[in-house]
């Protein structure tokens, strides 16, 4: 399609074609002897040549002889040199003067119809050069310099004659002799048909010979100055011009130099058709080819696109002044400045049309077609059997070559550079993608109007897709996804101009260590999401892009490179530029991460490199639920229902986990699977990891550095949750994950792996972790108590079960049954207490008497468990951690409290730990069931001596020390078994030092203690002062129950001096001197001291003597007022009474009187005869 109307397959453009052709034409025409300008110039109006009137075709020249037609070679070469290097001037005519003057050749500037215009518009030094004048007049566009219609018409005839004369072919054959021999297609063209020039224009990109290239360039410029000169164009597009109303096609009716507008109009019609579902006007196939052909031919020199040249002439001077014309450089420069504020609107519009044509046919871009020619052929991206409309599309070229790059194939750097430019171009202007216009027109008008520059429209649509501004149709969403794949911004963030500009500052600070354009820049940005370095605008743009990248694993180039083999092997994926309608978004990545966390036993695992990439992606995407396609798709309704107010970072997933039991089945499965995955690799929780970084560095760096986590890191964080360095965010995050774990035992990876077989065997159909823990721990306890030969729970499960039990004691919320039962009590009594560190549990214990029945029962059960296994008492273990290391390093977990109690009064004991031990002793003494050692030791004694109390007792409620008080009394009577006696002695000794360890005393004497012994009770260290105060003030005590308790104390102290700390302290030296040989217990040392007191030869310590005398008085008083506890006590009281003779006399007299009455009055019953008895 150049000179002679043959449409060819491959066309290229070059630089400034309009001028050299005329020089060559002049050289050819100068061969005539004394004739006018010659055939190509026609007899213009004027003299000497018999010119035709304007608008008429010039008459045919007579046939020249062969000799005339072919001058000698030297003359030909001279003429060619003259024509090619004379800047277009015609050689002097041989003979008479031509039109417009005499001698020196015919001059266009001297023609009457153009003289005035040339003088006004063109510089004087160009007047003698026909080509310079033609170029000058041809490029005039300003209204004030408008060319007259007569001159326009003259120029039209002049150019038409130039471009239609077959004799140009002979010049071409001489000027391009060596080129023609190299280009086989052109050498085979028939002679005399005028096809030669057309062929050379077709192959202009391959012409290396300077003179030939200049000749063809000039010829092309003349042709492109008017669409009617493009042979065949008018025939192919005549109907379309009329249909689209693109202007007149009749000669002379319109300014010939505005005919570039006609081509521009047709181009707009072509691109508009592609952007409409049902176009009203369709451009014919022949005209489409012709339009794209013209665009291809003008691709190397923007002068050849007449409409764009005139529209952008000023902008070229402004932005691309130093850009040399040729090879499409000016086009590219203007494209790069398209969205500059100072770019004129008409130029921007012309550039957009040009870009849309490139999108339809990549050959319209000279640089792209040239740079990628070999690569396209190498990777079969222009297969002949594909529809041309498809293979020519820019998107197809980009996808095909990108696929090669992603497969690791070598694509030339020049081609990759061009691809980068055009990918950026597509991302920058949505209007260049017909699919976006077609599918997203409504969304753009509704949501994104006025945002047409620098990629902002596409990001606006992305924002809508993310659900931040409304809903987006599926067709539009698919079109966006396709465009993202075509442009592939994941491979180079610079392709996305909106992202590039928004994130420039972040990249300069946070990612400056990564090479510009590296795919890992996006990964770096994701790692800094929601950090101080991230800026809000960058955050939005990044998440908008990541939304689409997350839905197609191929859009992450690093992931694709490392995992394509695994994906093909395990997930049956297609090639990079192939898609499967059957595979939902994110399906391949879901497949990859399922295999990433398989064990060696499960087989079919990912390669190490791929696994690392999958983990990287998981860590990044966990920051936003919208980056998980399956999660967002299945949980959209639940997110709206439960989590509409959770808008802060990471809250949506936490919210879904909190409402796990309320979610729809599909959503629950997705959230459950993700949570299960997190339990194995908590680093997926990127926000939590970021918050916990200081703790990880200080306490968990060993496990954090492991490539395979397997739950170790979370376990470490839980263990160090209450370190001083722990910040609030990390603690809250760790606790939240613990709470989520309680919903399903699968969410605790180590527990699941250690116990899954045991759970299936012993606890089938149990899902909640707390229930599984209870089930397994109950089984373990039963096996232990029954001394089973073999435990039903495996050793590895028992070990992990212990870890889980200990973790659950730290926060009441980790024990859901207890938490639910005590919610109202927590609100009433512990509202100011923070969760964690078992503080709420401790608060409930302290307020146990005020708790609701259900909560009280649960707390009692908890205390019973803790006393049986003190290691489960979180507060005790925490407060006494160092003391346990010091005093009980080898103690069994179940004897831990017993060991601490034995060392409680050591000088090295920490006061806080001592206080905590006392608290636990107080609790134990409220009920024998809370003291496992006592319970076991007194197993036979309790039912024997305290049966009445047991019958009245209720399960899950304290006996307030009644059983222990009962055993104390029997201890005083020396009637307990030796094991039980040992335990009761310890209790009596401890309670004698601290009144709080005697619940019955505290219960019945609270008023007396407050009134009579307030100062002693307020002492920080209890050493028996309160008990001594009560004993001293026994006579002042009015309450019978309290008096009874004090008397019981006196009775107990009589049994053994060790249970009377005040007396024991006072008499310690005397015991050592006088009673050292006496075995302690059963009142033996007390009797020794009493004997020493009566022995006048023994001198006791004054304090000891005084205390002993006080005790004797108290015992004497106690004996008088204390009620008999049985017949033996009654007999003892009678025998020790001063009036025993009187009492015995009264008793004897009463018996005698009763006997006498019987003798005197006879029998009371009726007499019965012997017969009746024997019957």
From Swiss-Prot:
The modification Phosphoserine is found at residue 957. The chain crosses the membrane at residues 1142-1162. Glycans are attached at residues 161, 206, 577, 673, 782. Residues 30-53, 95-106 have a biased composition (Gly residues). It is found in: Cell membrane; Golgi apparatus membrane; Golgi outpost; Cytoplasm, Cytoskeleton, Microtubule organizing center. Widely expressed; found in myeloid cells, fibroblasts, colon carcinoma, endothelioma, teratocarcinoma, lymphoma, myeloma. Residues 1163-1175 are cytoplasmic. Keywords: Cell membrane, Cytoplasm, Cytoskeleton, Glycoprotein, Golgi apparatus, Membrane, Phosphoprotein, Repeat, Sialic acid, Signal, Transmembrane, Transmembrane helix. Pfam families: Cys_rich_FGFR. InterPro entries: Cys-rich_GLG1_repeat, Cys-rich_GLG1_repeat_euk, GLG1. It is a single-pass type I membrane protein. This is Golgi apparatus protein 1. The gene is Glg1.
